[in-house]
C-alpha cells in the first residue's frame, strides 16, 4: 500500500481501523487453526510410523511365504491357487473432516477370506498355500490402512503450509502496511488540524488589529 495513494480523511482512518481489527481477528483464528493442524499432523505422523513398520513387516512375511509356496507347490501350483479365487476385495472411499480439511476414509471388505472363499479347496494343496494367501491378505489390509494415513498426512501438511503462508502474510505484510497507513493518516490529520488552528489564529489576530 503506497502512502502517496492514501487519502488522509477521517472516513479513511475509520475504514483502516476496521480493516486492522478484521485482519488481527483473522490472524488469531488462522494461527489457532495452524497450531491445531500441526497437532493433528503429529498424531497422524505417529500412526504413520507404526503403519509403515507394520506394512514392511507384512510385506517381508508375504514375500517369504511366496518363496516357500513356490518351493513346495511350484510356480504353476501357486498360480492355479491364485486364479481359483473368484471374489476380489472391495474398496469404498469415503471422507471425513479434520479441522476443515477433507481427508479420505477407506473401508474394505472381502480382503480376508475363508478356505471356501479362496476357491482352491483343501485337497490337492498344502497348508503353505493357505498361509501364503493369508499373508498376502494381511498385506493388502496394511496397504489400505497405510494409504489412508499417508494421504491424510499429505493433505494436512498441504493445509498447514497454506495456512502458514496466510498467517505470515497477515503478520508481516497486511497488518504492518495497514498500521503504517493508519499512522500516516493520523499524522496528516494532526498536521492539518494544527495548520487550520494556526490559520484561524492568524485570521483572528488580523481581525483584532
From Swiss-Prot:
Q: Where in the cell is it found?
A: Cell membrane
- Originating gene: atpD
UniProt-listed HAMAP family: ATP_synth_D_arch
Entry protein name: A-type ATP synthase subunit D
GO cellular component annotations, sorted alphabetically? plasma membrane
**Membrane topology classification:** Peripheral membrane protein
Q: Which family does it belong to?
A: Belongs to the V-ATPase D subunit family.
Q: Which terms are listed as keywords in the entry? A: ATP synthesis, Cell membrane, Hydrogen ion transport, Ion transport, Membrane, Transport
Q: Subunit structure of this entry?
A: Has multiple subunits with at least A(3), B(3), C, D, E, F, H, I and proteolipid K(x).
Q: Give the record's GO biological process terms.
A: proton motive force-driven plasma membrane ATP synthesis
